[in-house]
Structures are given as structure tokens and as C-alpha cells.
Amino acid sequence: MAETPRPAEHTSSLKIYFRLLSYVKPYVGIFLLSIVGFVIFASTQPMLAGILKYFVDGLSNPEAVLFPNVPYLRDLQLLQAVPLLIILIAAWQGLGSFLGNYFLAKVSLSLVHDLRVALFNKLLVLPNRYFDNHNSGHLISRITFNVTMVTGAATDAIKVVIREGLTVVFLFAYLLWMNWHLTLVMVAILPVIAVMVSIASKKFRKQSKKIQVAMGDVTHVASETIQGYRVVRSFGGEAYEQQRFGQASQSNTDKQLRMTKTGSLYTPMLQLVIYSAMAALMFLVLFLRGDSTAGDLVAYITAAGLLPKPIRQLSEVSSTIQKGLAGAESIFEQLDEAPEVDTGTVEKERVEGRLEVRNLSFTYPGTEREVLSDISFVAEPGQMIALVGRSGSGKSTLAALIPRFYHHDKGQILLDGVEIEHYRLRNLRRHVSQVTQHVTLFNDTVANNIAYGDLAGAPRADIEAAAADAYAKEFVDRLPKGFDTEVGENGVLLSGGQRQRLAIARALLKNAPLLILDEATSALDTESERHIQAALDHVMQGRTTLVIAHRLSTIEKADQILVMDQGRLVERGTHTELLAANGHYARLHAMGLDEPAKADIT
């Protein structure tokens, strides 16, 4: 492969890293305090080497004084001074260690929190197409796994760079002060170390990206299996899911091992280089000892012996940084995604509910086939419009365009005479309620599931009234804690009919003038279907309703039926008119339109 992109890659890495460090700005005071702690810690390393000089010299003359020219200390002999200094150095080092480790941990944990919140908040404003193109496992993995790796680069790596870097600087300064000629031998190995670090960094970065993708796959498979555990058990999919998860986990393990192998080879090679330089240095110290005292030689060798550990840790930090940079790339990629387009300025307290669609066409982003083509119709306030057609005819897509989950390419959608693009997005969605066949409930109480989002804080009386109108209160009152009963993840503790009635109660409490209804009840028992039909009749009263219709009983009551086929409106009229026309609708009716499983109208 050509190596020309390297400078750009280097610049990109620096750009990502500096952007990552920008998240530390709110904690700069705490961060500086941690740096002070690491400076204190690093300063003790040459002190420990220096104290050995006085200890060795004191063996031959314990009554010698340590500070002959300092008032009040000129009588302090080595016998008392050396033990006292060791205790003071240890206390000084402990203070530095506490300040550095505690306050950097505080910065690190705050950074984890900030990045996770930023990622989660971004998810809430991203357009639908983003979720269409990214599986949930990878999105969750970014918030959990990737963020942890990133904070390692932003804080843990800095800890090593500052603490061990300053240790190396202080030790080198001490060695130069003692014998600068010999110290140049140690300096000679630095270019070799730099080359090794550069080569290893590229490998770590590449392998880290692969590990993150593999970890996302593990999360995705586990998430899918847990969410669909009933289907897995019903269709005997245990063996298949075990195999799928095992393959994803094994792939992640293999990639982790490759990175470990790289690090395991890199560290001993680096140590060999460092200790070879140490061997040469010791030979020269013994060969060229000159007029140095035994204490001088011991102090010099000790200081030189303290160098390999921080140098090795500095070189190994490259792995942490590259892992973090790989994670940061994916995080910033999500944070840089454009949010939902919201350029509208119109806000209305309440609309009448007149819906007009003019020459509407739509193509999903990244595809070429037109899903909707030249659709036009008008729904007057309070009217019910039924959308009928085979699966894939574009009914659900049309319904998704009204609350602007997607943006149409051509034509107009007007609510009370105003193009929906001109409404502020949040205001537009306040005027629209949706009840779909895929009910979403949260792991919370019945009351909080009905009064969700903007409805939170609604009076209990209003919540109970909405539940009563949705024919839900009768079963809610039988629950252990009534409206304060937890419903489990996605309402798992409730039946399908009960979940749908809570969704209808939510729509009733919202009291929006425009209702979009996917009226699927084919999976319910007769009693549940009867209750839900009564609830739906109630929720549609006085509201403009767009129904993706499945049953004949609903269609017969519609003010207008729109028959769709391959993204086009092929027929429109009332039930009687369309039967008389003997066209698409009549054929669907003959197939048993009141039987969704046969008609496959979704």
C-alpha cells in the first residue's frame, strides 16, 4: 500500500486528540491540580537516587553533616538526616500521588459522563434515516465501550505522559548534573525508541478500530436475541443464536489477541534496547569512574536504573492513545451528524386538522426507486381517511412523512394551509398523535407510560379519564398497584391488547387534532379486539384521522378510501363507490380485506 496518506493521517490524529482534550476544558482547574500532583510525584524520583549517595557515603563517615552551610541544620549528621529525609520524601511522594490520581480520576469520570450524555442527546435529534442505516448494537457500543476507551486516551494517557514524562526529565536532569558525558549514552537510544513507538502506534490504531466494530457486533447480536427471546424460543432458534453470538464473540477475542500479541512483542523488544543502553552505561561507569565517590556511583546507577520503567510506560501509552483515537473517530462521527432539519418558524397553539397532500413524491435517501409518486388528497377537519393497499404500496411511508420523520422530495403536505416544513418540528409533532401496531412502552409505571414526554405532569384525573376512554382502566385497576404498577421492558408484563389500549390512552391524553392510526388487531383475541375497536372509535371522534386500514368494519366508516398500489393512488372514493367500480379495491375486498393476514395490508 502507498504510504502517502501518512502526513494527513498524523494531522487527523492530532486534530481528533485536541478535540478530545477540548472536553477537559470545563475541568481545567481540577486537571491542573492533578498535574501539580504528578510534578510532585516525579520530583521524588531523583531525590530517592540522591539520598542513596548520602547513605553510601555515610557508611564510611556516619558523623558527617548533610548541610554544613545551612543555619539550624549544620549540626544534622547523616545518621539522623538520611532516615528523616526518606520519610519526608515518601510523604511528599504520597501527597503528589493522591493529588494526581484522585483529581485526574474525577476529570476522567466526568469526561465519561459528558461524552455519554452528548452521544445520547445526539441520538434524540438524529433523523430516522440514521437509525435505518445503523444497527442498535453498534450505537449502544459507542455509548458504553467506545467512550471508556476514549477517556483512557484523554486522561489515563495524559497521566502517564505527564507523570512518567516528568520523571524521565527530572532523572535525565539529575544524570546530566552528575555526569553529562555518560548521560549522552542514554540519549543515543531515543531515536531508536521513537521509531519503535511510531511503528507500534499505527498497528495499535488499526487493530483498535477492528476491535470496536467486533464489540459492536457482539452487542448487536445479544441485543437482538434478548429483545426477540420469544421468537427465538418459539422457532427453536437457540442453536442458531448460540452459533451467531459465538462467532461474534470469537471474532472479538481474536482481534483482542492480535493487539495483545503486538503489545507483548513490542514491550520486550523495547526493554532489550533500553537495558542494552544501561549495560553500556554501567560498563562505562565502572571503566571511567575517575575520582567519583562510591556514593556518587551508586546514586548515578540508581537514577539510571529508574529510567527504563517510565520510558517503557511512555512507549506503551501509545496503545492507549491509539485505542482512544479509534473510539473518538466513531464518537465524533456521530456527534458531527446533521440533526433533523428544523428550519420552520410557524408555531400554533392548536390546529383545526385540515390535511392536504399535493403532488407528493418520495424516494428514500440512498435509493433510486420512487416509493411515492404524485399523491394528492384532502382530509377536512374531523374526517377519516382510510389507506388501503397491498404490502409495500407506500401506506406507512406516506404516514411517516406527515410528522416529518422523513423529508419529501417533491410536492407539498399542508396542515391548516401551512406547508409542514414551515412548522417548527416540535410544534408540528404536538399536533399529531400516532397509534401503531408496534406499541412501545417503557419500563415504568402505567401512569408514566400514558403521560409520557410532553404529557408528563398531567393530572392523575386526566390520566385515569384517558385510560377509561381507551377501555384500559378496567384492567389497570386489577393490577397490583393500579396506575403505579411497573409494566416491564416494553410492557412485557401486559398482554398485546392491554399494551395497545395504553397506547390509545396516551393518544387520547395528548388530544392532538390529527391522528395517524395503524389499526392492526389481527394478533388479538376477540374480547381484546372488541375493546380496542371501541377505544379506537372513541379516539377518532372529532379528529382528522389517517388510518392504515386492515378491517372492513373500519373502511366502511371512512369518509374517503385511498387505494394505493406501487406508490400511486389508483382509486379513491367511499366503500360503496369503490365496490361498484369493480377495480383494485373490489379485488382486495374479495380477498377478505377484513382478514389482515390474507390481505397482507401493512
Swiss-Prot record:
The chain crosses the membrane at residues 28-48, 84-104, 158-178, 180-200, 268-288. Gene3D superfamilies: ABC transporter type 1, transmembrane domain, P-loop containing nucleotide triphosphate hydrolases. Its main location: membrane. It is an enzyme of class 7 (translocase). It catalyses: ATP + H2O + lipid A-core oligosaccharideSide 1 = ADP + phosphate + lipid A-core oligosaccharideSide 2. Coiled coil: none annotated. ATP binds at residues 389-396. Keywords: ATP-binding, Cell inner membrane, Cell membrane, Lipid transport, Membrane, Nucleotide-binding, Translocase, Transmembrane, Transmembrane helix, Transport. It is a multi-pass membrane protein. Its EC number is 7.5.2.6. The keyword Heme does not apply. NCBIfam families: MsbA_lipidA. Homodimer. Involved in lipopolysaccharide (LPS) biosynthesis. Translocates lipid A-core from the inner to the outer leaflet of the inner membrane. Transmembrane domains (TMD) form a pore in the inner membrane and the ATP-binding domain (NBD) is responsible for energy generation. This is ATP-dependent lipid A-core flippase. It comes from Pseudomonas putida (strain ATCC 47054 / DSM 6125 / CFBP 8728 / NCIMB 11950 / KT2440). The gene is msbA.
